[in-house]
Amino acid sequence: MPEWALYALAAVAGYLSGSIPFGLVIVKAAGLGDIREIGSKSIGATNVLRTGRKDLALATFLLDSLKAGLVALAFTLLAGREVGFVAGFAAFIGHCYPVWLGFKGGKGIATYAGLLAFVSPLHGLVVAAPVWLGLFALTRISSLAALTAAVAVPPGAWLMGERNSLILAGLALLSVFVFWTHRENIGRLLKGTEPRFGAKKKDAPEA
């Protein structure tokens, strides 16, 4: 198969995998209604947590991670790390803009985590995870932790010796997308109104 065809196949497969709306399916299966009518209306794990079911939120996070990670791993084994990264990147896009839901999906953090875990695990473990966990522990603001981790990954990967231009460019572009999908959160962060985990509902706007 020509190289361009492998990249195209990876992109299509990744997008279709990423566009599976696990959050929507899980919440409906649990009899809790349409997640798109709850909280921020996002299909991601953070919004699923607003149903009060931590188990459903965890399941959503894991499945959203795997739908990017497994397709990325499959194409990495089939055609190399660059093609695998393209598949995972496309899964991120599919999650954020699923064709089945009118291109209105989640914010991409779980799929980003899945991509890192299966294609660049060292960058995820050494850079993304400690930054997210550390900042979340300090602030209890999930969006701030996610945005900071997204910013840290590209330079962190470079400092750790990553020199593949496609991977570095892709990581930088993913950071841009994360900021875009979190633009409403950024607005609230600037106003000081972004909710913290554990805050009383009456004091916490929708994230």
From Swiss-Prot:
Domain of life, per the record? Bacteria
The protein's location, in the record's own words, is: Cell inner membrane
- Provide a Gene Ontology MF annotation, just one: acyl-phosphate glycerol-3-phosphate acyltransferase activity
**Keyword list, A-Z:** Cell inner membrane, Cell membrane, Lipid biosynthesis, Lipid metabolism, Membrane, Phospholipid biosynthesis, Phospholipid metabolism, Transferase, Transmembrane, Transmembrane helix
Q: Pathway it belongs to? A: Lipid metabolism; phospholipid metabolism
Q: Which InterPro entries match?
A: G3P_acylTferase_PlsY (IPR003811)
Membrane topology label: Multi-pass membrane protein
Enzyme Commission number(s) of this protein:
2.3.1.275
HAMAP family (alphabetical): PlsY (MF_01043)
Q: What does the UniProt record say this protein does?
A: Catalyzes the transfer of an acyl group from acyl-phosphate (acyl-PO(4)) to glycerol-3-phosphate (G3P) to form lysophosphatidic acid (LPA). This enzyme utilizes acyl-phosphate as fatty acyl donor, but not acyl-CoA or acyl-ACP.
Q: What is this protein called?
A: Glycerol-3-phosphate acyltransferase
Specify the species. Hyphomonas neptunium (strain ATCC 15444)
